[in-house]
Amino acid sequence: PADVARLEGEGMNLRHKIAIGALVLVSTSFTSFLGKWEGTGQNVVYADPLALGLPTVCKGITRYTSPVPVVVGDYWSDARCAEVESLVVSKGQLALADCLTNQAIGQNTFDALSSHSHNVGVPATCASRAVGLLNAGDIAAGCKALAWAPDGRTPVWSYVTDAQGKKRFVPGLHARRIDEAGVCIK
């Protein structure tokens, strides 16, 4: 039985679905979705006010994700943005796939989770209630949990912490979470 389960993919992460082409890294739909929320044409590194001035460029590339320095004021060509974005997204999606074990997760759900993890970090997404529900087989509840607390009314993943340590709700972040939840369930 254990050998049969392994052959059927139960308990395995989703990297094998990527290897066989059942899930696509840096899909066109994901790249477009990321551009919607992270912006396009952001070629000059800026201090992101929502991230306490974290230097950010292109579609949300920061020093935490980039293999090259991200320095406020530097100019990145479109080609450099595309190259580094592809590396950053691929690396993030492979790490995300390691924590996803529900073989029913399809491209849309994977893309939604990829957007979430690109924004809040792979470790936070992997530790989220949403991923727990998705891995347990409840796709609908897991997708909803990207934007909402268990009560279905309280926004989640939609707050920033200011320099004084106070959490502040950001409507734009919640709009992104709602959009991710919608893509996730498609």
Placement of each model-derived feature along the sequence:
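Mid-length scaffold segments of soluble, non-membrane domains
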Residues: D74-R129
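Alpha-helical protein-protein interaction elements
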Residues: L25, S29, N102, N108-F110, ...
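Amphipathic, alpha-helical segments enriched in basic
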Residues: G60, P67, V71, S114-S117
